[in-house]
Amino acid sequence: MAREKFERNKPHVNIGTIGHVDHGKTTLTAAITNVLAKKGQAQAQDYGDIDGAPEERERGITINTAHVEYETDGRHYAHVDCPGHADYVKNMITGAAQMDGAILVCAATDGPMAQTKEHILLAKQVGVPALVVALNKCDMVDDPEIIELVEMEIRELLDSYDFPGDEIPIVQVSGLKALEGDSEWEGKVEELMKAVDASIPEPEREVDKPFLMAVEDVFSITGRGTVATGRIERGKVTVGEEVEIVGIRDTRLTTVTGVEMFRKLLDEGMAGDNVGLLLRGIQKEDIERGMVLVKKGSITPHTQFEGEVYVLKKEEGGRHTPFFAGYRPQFYIRTTDVTGQITAFTADDGSSVEMVMPGDRIKMTGELICPVAIEQGMRFAIREGGRTIGAGVVSKIIK
């Protein structure tokens, strides 16, 4: 049977369910697929299908994640749901599941709990741009005043993490009742998806952003010049265009004289393509793995940054012992290891800590020995002798 072609007739958006353990994230995810399946926009999945999420490896870290897909009238969604709290932390920090927005699930019976707060904070730190709240288990609360109080509490909480608490839609749902086929609650799930359609903005397509390609390999072709290969991360590049070579050494300007993919010559390469770019006037020794080719003037290299980091446990292949300020690991950024130093760190909530234990989540300040094209929101791994001991996301550029 021929493989089904992915139809691109609707804009694609990546979302996920976040929130406290047992507040009903997975049940709600199942309910969404069941309600939309009745309109032919999804394949119905039950709790067990989603809860038995397979393990995945992302940057050397094992994460359990369930992926479901569905459509609404206007969009195609890829939706991630994680079984355990630690999986969320790892998922959001490694960017294994990039989210354009999230559904924050909060049980009306409990109100916001510890992980509700932690997930909102994480969403803020890793740059999830928009949230919609699903106030779940509303079938179990008879008193509308209680629901009103919980809603106020959620809005204040969102405000305290710099999300627009007053504007974020809160939809009262019951994932369980909707899953059981109760039409009133099925209607609420539809209402939730309408809110998601309306308030989670469509992401800017990678191809519309300024060109960037991380260099993976370099070789010279006799009589033609130097070729840099890699996957175009964003934007597009045309033959004859000027690009900058950024990172590790001083920034240089060159012209792309050829774009090649699968041994064929192209007029342009675009986001997602694995290409070889022929560069004018550049010697093989002028460019190396770890540098990036970018649209002229779009990016500057940096050496100092702040990051949110998850440090692997011993069982995950991480360190067995703690580390202290001044620790010098390698930072694996895009395609290369750069030596650097963790000059300072605090616990995730900003309180001071003396040392970092395997399994901790920290905020850290890092300093690299040479300038590299790092950007806010970018993911990196922390390595020691070639093995990953932590994963992070750049939360702020200092210098």
From Swiss-Prot:
One of its GO terms (cellular component) is cytosol. Residues 81-84 are annotated as: G3. GTP binds at residues 19-26, 81-85, 136-139. Residues 136-139 are annotated as: G4. It is found in: Cytoplasm. It catalyses: GTP + H2O = GDP + phosphate + H(+). It comes from the Bacteria. Residues 19-26 are annotated as: G1. GO terms for molecular function: GTP binding; GTPase activity; translation elongation factor activity. Residues 60-64 are annotated as: G2. Residues 174-176 are annotated as: G5. Its EC number is 3.6.5.3. Keywords: Cytoplasm, Elongation factor, GTP-binding, Hydrolase, Magnesium, Metal-binding, Nucleotide-binding, Protein biosynthesis. Transmembrane segments: none annotated. GTP hydrolase that promotes the GTP-dependent binding of aminoacyl-tRNA to the A-site of ribosomes during protein biosynthesis. PANTHER family: ELONGATION FACTOR TU, MITOCHONDRIAL, ELONGATION FACTOR TU-RELATED. Belongs to the TRAFAC class translation factor GTPase superfamily. Classic translation factor GTPase family. EF-Tu/EF-1A subfamily. This is Elongation factor Tu. The gene is tuf.
